[in-house]
C-alpha cells in the first residue's frame, strides 16, 4: 500500500468516525477505536475507550454535529498523525456545548486496519 492509499484510507475512517459520533453508531466506533485508545477532552479529562463509549451509550454525551476542517494526515510507517479543526455541538449532562476545537488524532496500523489510538483537543477562542 502506498502512503497515498494509506492516507485515503485513514481519511475515510476518520470521516466515518465523525459520522458515527453524530449517529451514536457504537459498532462503528468500537471497530475504529483501538481497545487501548485514550481520549483527552478539551477540558483535560482523560478517558479510556470504554469510559468514553459508556458515556455515549448512557446518553450522558450526545453529539449533534461534528464538522472537521483543515484535516491534515502525516504517515510515519505504521502510524499516522492527524491534525485539524472541528466545530462541534454536543449535549453533555443535559447542557448544550458549541465548541471549536483544534485536535490531534493518532492512528496505528493494527493487522490490516488503521485504528484510532489517541485523541487530544484544545478549545479555540
Residue ranges, per PLM feature:
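A beta-strand edge to alpha-helix "cap/lid" segment located at domain peripheries
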Residues: 1-125
